Amino acid sequence: MGGGIDMSFANAGISVTLLELNQKGLDAGLALIGKNYATTVSKGKLSQEQASARQALISGTTDYEALADVDLVIEAVFESMDVKRQVFGRLDEVCKEGAILASNTSYLDVNEIAAATSRPQDVVGLHFFSPANVMRLLEVVRADKTAEDVIATAMALGKRIGKVPVLAGVCYGFIG
């Protein structure tokens, strides 16, 4: 899922840093992105030059500290509340003040995820549908304390990357 989200941003000309816990996972993720772009080229939907330019916008790291100055982080780990809370606690420590911390959860309580941080006003759900680089629907999930400017930014960014953003509240299963 993370690779498709990365591609959605790169396809819109936005640079992305892919974080994985280890080099093996990072190499596999970047290779899958490369394979997806190669498939798109082979189908004649992109030139090799376009695919290469987009792929060049995606860098990788295994170090959370590389996210210190980013404006937005989208977490795309598996659907475990414990894991998501651990990730958000770490993001809270390393990301700059005002950075938007988004979860790609498809059904977990964004309020509970936000509670793992000291800045619940900056936490939002951004649920991409699979494959994220193809599917256009994007659920923007407002938690109880999500700030209005975070919602506005998420909605505008969804449009910028070619998605159809739909605002939802926290509920089991959201919209999709």
Q: Residue locations for each model-derived region?
A:
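NAD(P)+-binding Rossmann beta1-loop-alpha1 motif at the extreme N-terminus of oxidoreductases
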Residues: 1-36, 59
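Short, structured coil segments at secondary-structure junctions
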Residues: 12, 118-119, 161
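Short beta-alpha connecting loops at secondary-structure transitions
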Residues: 15-23, 135-143, 167-172
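Rossmann-like NAD(P)-binding element
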Residues: 24-28, 39-101, 107-111, 116, ...
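Internal alpha-helical scaffold of NAD(P)-dependent oxidoreductase catalytic cores
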Residues: 140-170
